Amino acid sequence: MDNNIIIGAMTALITPFKNGKLDEQTYHKLIKRQIANGIDAVVPVGTTGESATLTHEEHRICIEIALDACKGSSCKVLAGAGSNATHEAVSLAKFAQEHGADGILSVTPYYNKPTQEGLYLHYKEIAKSIDIPVLLYNVPGRTGCDLQTETIIRLFRDCENIYGVKEASGSIDKCVDLLAHEPRMMLLSGEDAINYPILSNGGKGVISVTSNLLPDMISKLTHFALEEKYIEAKKINDELYNINKILFCESNPIPIKAAMYIAGLTPTLEYRLPLCKPSDCNLAKIEAIMKNYDIKGF
């Protein structure tokens, strides 16, 4: 497992649409741009990829495109494979493995509010259905349930292919507590605002929204921190403060998709309802802040 774990700078990919349908050509180009700018892994069909409003067929196509785009490169594919129905999550995980994904990211079940025992059994079922690495994903602000430290550690110790967790609870204390109790755990930041604090407290990588727009900066920040060059890492983190903040002025991925469109990286600005375009006020703020950054094209 040690040789197969997926850490470092990762991008939670947006899913571009054109005339209401998946824009496969743009999606492929966006991934190639990530690879060219030093990203270690891409994460298709997660929260940022609007997975909740994709059909199962679109979900699978996104994974296939990511695998094709990363072929022959060192960039890995950590495929989104989450659902609030365990059997669906298992099916998505199996698809990812069968098609060559390097690992899966699986969010906690949303809406049905399982107990900690239910969460344990959910992830145990997913883990035993595949052989590739599994990264837990805790984002209670969106799912309505919090994967507690004790449950994370229990899963890590009981399931050989569960290697870590993407923590997006916003709690540095929880992250420090987790690593204090299980230092072998691979902890990844799931929130751009706290990338540096997590990396400087033992985290092993980030799954970033901002890196859709600025993959080179997120890659440098992450690798400086992993090399314990904390002064250099903090300098980049400070430079990213304003863009990180504005990219969450509305629900993710509303602002990042707007930013990608403004930067000319996507030909259209489309969402799947109930997500919609940002307010004119926020759109103007996003555009103004973007002028302070060197955003690389294709």
From Swiss-Prot:
One of its GO terms (cellular component) is cytosol. Pathway: Amino-acid biosynthesis; L-lysine biosynthesis via DAP pathway; (S)-tetrahydrodipicolinate from L-aspartate: step 3/4. GO terms for biological process: diaminopimelate biosynthetic process; lysine biosynthetic process via diaminopimelate. The keyword Cytoplasm applies. It comes from the Bacteria. It is found in: Cytoplasm. The record marks 47, 111 as: Part of a proton relay during catalysis. GO terms for molecular function: 4-hydroxy-tetrahydrodipicolinate synthase activity. The active site is at 137 (proton donor/acceptor), 166 (schiff-base intermediate with substrate). It catalyses: L-aspartate 4-semialdehyde + pyruvate = (2S,4S)-4-hydroxy-2,3,4,5-tetrahydrodipicolinate + H2O + H(+). Its main location: cytoplasm. Its EC number is 4.3.3.7. SMART domains: DHDPS. Keywords: Amino-acid biosynthesis, Cytoplasm, Diaminopimelate biosynthesis, Lyase, Lysine biosynthesis, Schiff base. Catalyzes the condensation of (S)-aspartate-beta-semialdehyde [(S)-ASA] and pyruvate to 4-hydroxy-tetrahydrodipicolinate (HTPA). Belongs to the DapA family. Homotetramer; dimer of dimers. This is 4-hydroxy-tetrahydrodipicolinate synthase. It comes from Campylobacter lari (strain RM2100 / D67 / ATCC BAA-1060).
